[in-house]
Amino acid sequence: MQPILDWEKNELNTTGLGLIPMVIESSGRGERAYDIYSRLLRERIIFLVGPVTETSANLVIAQLLFLESENSEKDISLYINSPGGLVTAGLAVYDTMQFIKPDVSTLCIGQAASMGALLLTAGAKGKRYCLPNSRVMIHQPLGGFQGQASDIEIHAKEILALKGRLNEILAKHTSQTIRTIEKDTDRDNFLGAEAAVKYSLVDAVLTSRKVKHE
């Protein structure tokens, strides 16, 4: 699945340059340094930033399971800024979100496109949010295959089956009909924050921090 916009092909890779901010905490036992994402994980905040890949999906899944083991009653917050990605990887995250006991609250920051949009709307009902200038995009799965005619037919059937399953998931979490979902995902369908609320992809637009993460 393709990103919404790709302004810079040679985007600065801050991870590779070691520019992830570090947080120093002092206690009676001395000082301890955390990278910023690990520190936020202590507050039960998980980030899904960038394409949904096997690697990023596995990291999110591991963090979800870890936070459930730490406290199975407290909500988990999943912040999403993603252009989408692998369907199977995204569905693995989706299944884990539904499987674990804590509610997973989702928040779109920037964009939630394709599989990112599905994960956004898969958050706990009443706890799905986006920021005012966020963009959400839904569409049908993309795919391509080369080979013998019989193999192409097999893969075409699989893509259609995935399309049907993704439509069912969107219908379940938005309360839209399957027919409506099929029509609205036939092509790339972009929605602003308020439109995403009207479509029931999210429950509210947050303009300031009104929801305290426990």
UniProtKB/Swiss-Prot annotation:
Disulfide feature: none
Reactions catalysed: Hydrolysis of proteins to small peptides in the presence of ATP and magnesium. alpha-casein is the usual test substrate. In the absence of ATP, only oligopeptides shorter than five residues are hydrolyzed (such as succinyl-Leu-Tyr-|-NHMec, and Leu-Tyr-Leu-|-Tyr-Trp, in which cleavage of the -Tyr-|-Leu- and -Tyr-|-Trp bonds also occurs)
Major enzyme class: hydrolase
One Pfam short name: CLP_protease
Source domain of life: Bacteria
InterPro entries assigned to the protein according to its UniProt record, in alphabetical order: ClpP, ClpP/crotonase-like_dom_sf, ClpP/TepA, ClpP_His_AS, ClpP_Ser_AS
Database matches in PANTHER family: ATP-DEPENDENT CLP PROTEASE PROTEOLYTIC SUBUNIT
Protein name as annotated: ATP-dependent Clp protease proteolytic subunit
Organism of this sequence: Nitrosomonas eutropha (strain DSM 101675 / C91 / Nm57)
Phylogenetic placement of the source organism: Bacteria, Pseudomonadati, Pseudomonadota, Betaproteobacteria, Nitrosomonadales
